[in-house]
Structures are given as C-alpha cells and as structure tokens.
Design a protein with these regions (language model features):
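Bacterial N-terminal signal peptides that target proteins for export
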Residues: 2-16
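Bacterial N-terminal signal peptides
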Residues: 14-25
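Bacterial Sec-dependent signal peptides at the C-terminal "C-region" and cleavage site
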Residues: 23-33
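Flexible, processing/modification-adjacent segments and terminal tails
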Residues: 32-40, 44-62, 66-68, 96, ...
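Extended beta-sheet lipid-handling architectures
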Residues: 54-57, 72, 85, 197
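Beta-strand elements of well-folded, non-transmembrane domains
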Residues: 60, 77-79, 161, 175
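An acidic-aromatic
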Residues: 74-124, 193-194
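Gly/Pro-enriched, hydrophobic low-complexity segments
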Residues: 135-225
C-alpha cells in the first residue's frame, strides 16, 4: 500500500515538473544547437559557488532480484562538498556529509552509520558532483546524447577509472536554466538508481551546522570503513 502511494506521488510530482517547463518558454532552438563544451560551461556557471536545496524522488531497481524501491525527501547542498539528504518516505533517514565525514542516521532504529565521505561519494556516487560540479569534467568522459524529451540536454558520463559500482551516469539538464533535474546511475550488474529533482532554490543560506551530526545518546554506532 505504501509503495502504491509513493508511486502515485511520484507520477503527480513528475507531471508538475513537466508542466512547469512547458509553461516557462518554448524558445529552445538556440539552446539545442549548443556544443557539449558550451552546455558544460553553463552548467558549471549555474552551480559553482552556490548553495541550493530541492525536493527529490528516488527509484532504485535491483535487477537480479526484480526489486524496485521508491523514496522521497529533500536535499540540501552547500558548496563545496557538503550535502544533506533528508528521506521522508518510506521511512525517515538522514545522510549527511561535510565533505570529509559521512553520517547515516536511522531514527526508527536509533542507529548511526559513519565513515569516510570520499570512500562512499567518490566518482559521482550519491550524486556527489552536485556539491562541486567541476568534478564532472575531472572524473568522467562526457558525451551528448540524443534527447527523447525536447526540454532537456541529455549527458552521458562514464568514469575515467573503471569500477563495478558506477559504470554509467545519465544527466538530464534543462535547456532554459541548465539545472540538473534527473540523475540515473547504472552499475555493472544492471541495477539502476534514478533520482528526479523539483522545486530547486538556489543561493539559499544554509548554515554549516546542517552538514554535521551529533550522535544521539544510546545510539548504535556502526563504523562503515572498518
């Protein structure tokens, strides 16, 4: 029942995203003629040095087990390197990094998983490049794909260093604002992690305390990198 409600919410929110883009502007001819380098320049200009927050919907598919999970919440990003993911559905969970340390807190279990942020957010995992967009050019081979949806530039990112957990990342970038509204990550097993963003707010004031975490008394603490 929860999955059905989450899936319904995802459909409604995706519809709102598309309607908002249709209403903004139809003058995409010039934008569609941009080169890959020009698109990357504009994306970097849009994100570099800026804080932002947005809502997200996540769909994770484990191919071998035929499992599809849905989740939603809010993301907060402070440049450079700081992120906070607040999952609200199907259950509350917080993922926080200050660029150095990582905390994952599950209130229902009173459990905290902690470790080194670079070990878990390297090479684009967890959409980490959103906190420092210039990492895209440094870490990936990038190509411009044909878009099935006329509102977006579709970018294909392949890690320069081969790895099993991330072999391919697809970015959907709006043609009018150069905002990343969809990230799809694939691994070598054919699993897919799709994140869609909406209601972006840029240049917001995000206190540094949002990106640190104080472990609650009595919490079960698990070291991820041991």
């Amino acid at each position: 029942m929860k999955k059905k409600r989450t899936h319904k919410s995802r459909i409604l929110l995706t519809g709102l995203i598309l309607i908002s883009f249709i209403a903004v502007n139809f003058s995409y001819t010039a934008a569609s003629e941009l080169t890959l380098e020009q698109i990357l320049d504009r994306v970097e200009k849009h994100y570099t040095g800026k804080n932002f927050q947005a809502e997200f919907i996540q769909e994770s598919t484990i191919k071998a087990m035929d499992i599809v999970d849905f989740a939603s919440g809010k993301i907060f990003v402070r440049y450079p390197g700081m992120m906070r993911w607040e999952y609200e559905k199907p259950e509350k969970q917080i993922i926080i990094t200050d660029g150095h340390k990582l905390w994952i807190y599950r209130p229902s279990d009173n459990q905290v998983l902690t470790g080194s942020a670079p070990a878990f957010f390297s090479d684009g995992k967890g959409a980490s490049f959103l906190s420092d967009i210039k990492l895209i050019r440094q870490k990936f081979k990038i190509s411009l794909e044909n878009s099935k949806e006329g509102f977006f530039h579709e970018l294909k990112l392949q890690p320069l260093e081969k790895r099993l957990d991330v072999i391919d990342i697809r970015l959907s970038v709006t043609k009018n604002t150069f905002t990343v509204i969809r990230i799809i990550t694939y691994n070598s097993y054919g699993d897919e992690n799709r994140i869609e963003f909406a209601n972006h707010q840029f240049d917001v004031k995000l206190d540094e305390s949002l990106f640190s975490f104080e472990i609650p008394p009595g919490a079960d603490v698990v070291q991820l990198d041991e």
